[in-house]
Every structure is written in structure tokens, then in C-alpha cells.
UniProtKB/Swiss-Prot annotation:
Pfam families: UL40. This is Protein UL40. Keywords: Host-virus interaction, Modulation of host NK-cell activity by virus, Viral immunoevasion. InterPro entries: Herpes_UL40 (IPR019624). It comes from the Viruses. Residues 15-23 are annotated as: HLA-E-binding epitope. One of its GO terms (biological process) is symbiont-mediated suppression of host natural killer cell activation. Plays a role in the protection against host NK-cell cytotoxicity by up-regulating the cell surface expression of HLA-E independent of TAP (HLA-E has an inhibitory effect on the cytotoxic activity of the NK cell). Also promotes cell surface expression of UL18, another viral protein involved in NK-cell evasion. Belongs to the HHV-5 UL40 protein family.
């Protein structure tokens, strides 16, 4: 019995080894191509920030986003959103009203006005955070995209501060880490491997879930 089980497992391994090797090589080639073709870290901002990690620019959101580039390529990127404030005359945040053609402009809730009383984050120092929604960040520039950031709030979260200060969002797009994209490729690869008609049946027979036709043929003989 042990000899037959060893033969059955060896047969399964012999059949599956070439397919597994081909699948592994294919996935590695896809991963290498993805790394080579992924764009470098991109700064998407309405403000020129000298220190994006300083106290004036805290990180307010981090997530995944698909970035579409003018070449037509699409890449999975990690999106970091910093909220930058101008708190004094000696500020490190320099706002630009005329970005270059290749600079993406972020339209966020700090320009949002309520239709009821006209309160704006920019000109009303007693505005509350609910007056300044920022549920969607529109990225406009070389390419047009829209990121639905449902958890991103406006810089007006500081209810008791002087909200007449100028605010801007500083966005950074960087290549996705070895995680979500890779697991997605492996999942597709496993499903593709399952397209072989005998893949699942061979595994089931090797585990004893399905009867082995060769085994029953020997018994009948």
C-alpha cells in the first residue's frame, strides 16, 4: 500500500513539476517586467514643500491607487497624502497658482463653500470641519484621474484654530510594495494553472478524495 501511495505521489509530482516550473518562471517574468516598467516616485502637489514629513505637513491618508500615465500604461501605486498648512510668515510651504503643464493640480475641499451661508475654509476663521468636506480628490494635469478618498478629511479638522490659514494637499505616488500586486498575480496564475483539465483531479486522487482509475483497474484484473 505504501509502495502504491509513493508511486501515485511520484506520478503526480512528475506531471505537475513542469507545469509548476513554467508557472513560476512566468510569474517571475511578470514581476520583473512590472518592476522595470513601474514609474518612479511622483510628487503630486499644489504646494512646493521643503519638508513633507514636518509638523506642517502631517500624513493624513495612505492607500492604493491606480495611476494612468500619458503613455497609456497603468500601474498600481501607493498614495501618500500630506496636509500642509501655512502657519506663519516664515513658512516652508510655498503655494503655486500657476503650475507647470506637467505638474498635477489637486482640487480639494479647502475651496469648498456651503451654499447655505457661503462659509469657506479660506476666508472664514470660525468654519467647522463639516463645512469643508473633501471626499474626492481630483488629480488634473498630464493625465486626468480621480481618487475617491472616503476617509480623507479636510485640513479644517482643527475646529478651534484660525482656519483662514492657507492649506494645500501634498500627494506622493510611489510604486506599490511587494504585496497586493504580487498576490493578485499569483492568484491569477493559480487560476490559470487550474485551467488544465487534469490539475485538480490529480491532486484529489493523490489525497485519496477521488478513486484512482489505475488502482481499480488493477483490482479488476
Amino acid at each position: 500500500m505504501n509502495k502504491f501511495s509513493n508511486t501515485r505521489i511520484g506520478f503526480t509530482c512528475a506531471v505537475m513539476a513542469p507545469r509548476t516550473l513554467i508557472l513560476t518562471v512566468g510569474l517571475l517574468c511578470m514581476r520583473i517586467r512590472s518592476l522595470l516598467c513601474s514609474p518612479a516616485e511622483t510628487t503630486v502637489t499644489t504646494a512646493a514643500v521643503t519638508s513633507a514629513h514636518g509638523p506642517l505637513c502631517p500624513l493624513v491618508f495612505q492607500g492604493w491607487a491606480y495611476a494612468v500615465y500619458h503613455q497609456g500604461d497603468m500601474a498600481l501605486m501607493t498614495l501618500d497624502v500630506y496636509c500642509c498648512r501655512q502657519t506663519s510668515n516664515n513658512t516652508v510651504v510655498a503655494f503655486s497658482h500657476h503650475p507647470a503643464d506637467n505638474t498635477l493640480l489637486i482640487e480639494v475641499g479647502n475651496n469648498t463653500r456651503r451654499h447655505v451661508d457661503g462659509i469657506s475654509c479660506q476666508d472664514h476663521f470660525r468654519a467647522q470641519h463639516q463645512d469643508c468636506p473633501a471626499q474626492t480628490v481630483h488629480v488634473r494635469g498630464v493625465n486626468e484621474s480621480a481618487f475617491g478618498l472616503t476617509h480623507l478629511q479636510s485640513c479644517c479638522l482643527n475646529e478651534h484654530s484660525q482656519l483662514s490659514e492657507r492649506v494645500a494637499y501634498h500627494l506622493k505616488l510611489r510604486p506599490a510594495t511587494f504585496g497586493l500586486e504580487t498576490w493578485a498575480m499569483y492568484t491569477v496564475g493559480i487560476l490559470a494553472l487550474g485551467s488544465f483539465s487534469s490539475f485538480y483531479s490529480q491532486i484529489a486522487r493523490s489525497l485519496g478524495v477521488l478513486p484512482n482509475d489505475h488502482h481499480y483497474a488493477l483490482k479488476k484484473a
